[in-house]
Design a protein with these regions (language model features):
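Conserved ATP-binding subdomain of kinase catalytic cores across diverse folds
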Residues: 1-71, 95, 99-100
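C-terminal catalytic region of ATP-dependent kinase domains
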Residues: 111, 115-178
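Conserved kinase catalytic-core segment
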Residues: 34, 39-42, 76-131
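Conserved aromatic-histidine-acidic binding/catalytic patches
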Residues: 21, 25, 80-81, 85, ...
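Charged, low-complexity, helix-prone segments enriched in Lys/Glu/Asp/Gln
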Residues: 26, 92, 172-176
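Charged, low-complexity surface segments at secondary-structure and domain boundaries
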Residues: 73-78, 158-159
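A short, charged
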Residues: 44-47, 102-103, 107, 155, ...
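Poly-acidic low-complexity segments
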Residues: 2, 84, 98, 163-165, ...
């Protein structure tokens, strides 16, 4: 997917992801996921739908405060902190709510202060009505993509390798329902 950086008048970097005219719904889906995500994480990475140089796409503020090992691709679930597990539960609620089943380990990033952010919700609503809310559901397997990190984490919990508090998930569901 095409991506490019833009700098705003304040010197902040933004990642622009243009989409083809037939795929404008993807950009709108990303912004919708951000707006819903703010209900449970006011610090969610800002995403907007925008037209730049005649091209529609989504644009998100670029994070500059990330840890050196900023994503979870090399993090086994048993090495997660309890705070990371709780934040991953929060992002799981959002991704299931918007039917985004592409939340693999590279789409969860962590800041130096320990905050976990879910990014790249470009598949939001893609499988809505056809999806299966199961930790075994992995529709992007056919594309050779990693499974959603949530599947990996919750399978580790099922196997007794990590612990998580279901009340955390319930709290985030209730926050969205308000």
């Amino acid at each position: 997917h095409e991506k490019e950086f833009w700098i705003d008048e304040h010197g902040d970097r933004w990642l622009f992801k243009p989409v083809a005219e037939r795929d404008e719904f993807v950009a709108h889906g990303e912004e919708s996921a951000y707006r819903i995500g703010r209900l449970i994480d006011p610090d969610a990475v800002e995403v907007r739908t925008i037209r730049l140089n005649g091209r529609m796409g989504s644009i998100q503020r670029w994070r500059t405060d990330l840890k050196a090992d900023f994503d979870f691709r090399h993090t086994l679930p048993e090495n997660l902190t309890s705070d990371e597990v709780a934040q991953i539960q929060r992002e799981h609620v959002l991704d299931w709510l918007v039917s985004n089943h592409d939340g693999h380990a590279k789409q969860l990033i962590r800041a130096k202060d320990g905050h976990v952010y879910g990014i790249d919700k470009g598949q939001a609503f893609k499988f809505l009505g056809k999806d299966n809310l199961s930790v075994d559901y992995h529709p992007n397997r056919a594309c050779g993509e990693q499974e959603p990190y949530y599947n990996t984490v919750f399978r580790a919990a099922k196997d007794g390798k990590i612990r998580f508090d279901p009340a955390v998930t319930l709290r985030h569901i209730q926050e969205v329902e308000k």
